Amino acid sequence: MPNLTIALDAMGGDFGPHVTIPAAINILKKYKYLSIYLVGNEAEINSLLQNTSTSIKSRFTIIPSLDDIPMDLAPALALRNFKQSSMRMALNLVREGKAQACVSAGNTGALMVLSRHLLKVLPFVDRPALVSTLPSMTTQPVYMLDLGVNVSCDADALLQFALMGSALAEHVGNIPIPRVALLNVGQEDIKGNDLVKHAAQLLSKNPNLNYIGFIEGNDIFSGKADVIVCDGFTGNVALKTSEGVVDLVISQLTSVSNNNIFTKLLSLLVKPLIMSSLKRLKPDQYNGATLLGLPGIVIKSHGNAKQVAFEFAIEQAVKEVESGLVNKISASLDIID
């Protein structure tokens, strides 16, 4: 297995190096051929590596940074200022060819703007898209994009999203002929706005896509489609709503045992089974959204990700680099006029 190097924005997210460093240590134990750049506050990073074995430490390279981009900072300000931020410096390592991927739990808008500014975009790509895996009723996950970085876009952009998402599902998700659908308010051809109707025409004519038509919100997790395409506003609302529903169900199941003696007894029997099933819906194991359309791998972790969730994000970067995803996406886009 060839050596692989990833750059981590060690300071990003709600918990910064207290999550990113332990996660990175565990990942190095699992992937013996992996090396990691840790970009951030050198003193903080070193303090968290004190009890790490020499063999693991030798595969870390610390790159000191001077700034951290606040989570609520406007993307334009992140671009103009914060030249020595951990996020920007981690992305620069990818641009310079020193790392094959960057992983950050920092400000999503800043990551998008800086990635596009520093790395540019692939030929035939107008704008990168944010894609993530979601659980389904089958054994296969669902890939959904865009999830928020393109709140408005045209039909040509949705075609690009579809091609990139299909390449991801095929080469990283190991789905031979991914089924691609457009998220809409109905399945009939007459349903939807002009955007999705025009996009449907483009997707149906593209020979690189296995386009199956429209899909409704209630079927996102059904497994009927492998790749679901929409604008970023729609995708983000759908994603956050589904996460909220999972939290609500788990909260209700946790509190139901306090009602009376019957529900207490029933919960002792049933709740462990239900909670076990619901664990596969928790976002931790699906952490790690990808910015597709760049000449390098950039992974966005949830800002509130804990250690295990951040490990999933790093693993997603490893899988995408190993699959040669960037080249596969470039090949899939070559057919666009």
From Swiss-Prot:
The EC number(s) this enzyme carries: 2.3.1.274
GO annotation terms (biological process): fatty acid biosynthetic process; phospholipid biosynthetic process
InterPro entries: FA_synthesis, Phospholipid_synth_PlsX-like
Subcellular location: Cytoplasm
Keyword vocabulary terms for this entry: Cytoplasm, Lipid biosynthesis, Lipid metabolism, Phospholipid biosynthesis, Phospholipid metabolism, Transferase
Catalysed reactions, semicolon-separated: a fatty acyl-[ACP] + phosphate = an acyl phosphate + holo-[ACP]
UniProt main location, coarse: cytoplasm
One GO MF term: phosphate:acyl-[acyl carrier protein] acyltransferase activity
Cellular component, GO annotation: cytoplasm
Pathway stated in the Swiss-Prot or TrEMBL entry: Lipid metabolism; phospholipid metabolism
Bridged cysteine pairs (disulfide): none
UniProt record similarity statement: Belongs to the PlsX family.
Subunit organization: Homodimer. Probably interacts with PlsY.
PANTHER family per UniProt: FATTY ACID/PHOSPHOLIPID SYNTHESIS PROTEIN PLSX, PHOSPHATE ACYLTRANSFERASE
Function: Catalyzes the reversible formation of acyl-phosphate (acyl-PO(4)) from acyl-[acyl-carrier-protein] (acyl-ACP). This enzyme utilizes acyl-ACP as fatty acyl donor, but not acyl-CoA.
The name this protein goes by in its record: Phosphate acyltransferase
Species lineage: Bacteria, Pseudomonadati, Pseudomonadota, Gammaproteobacteria, Alteromonadales
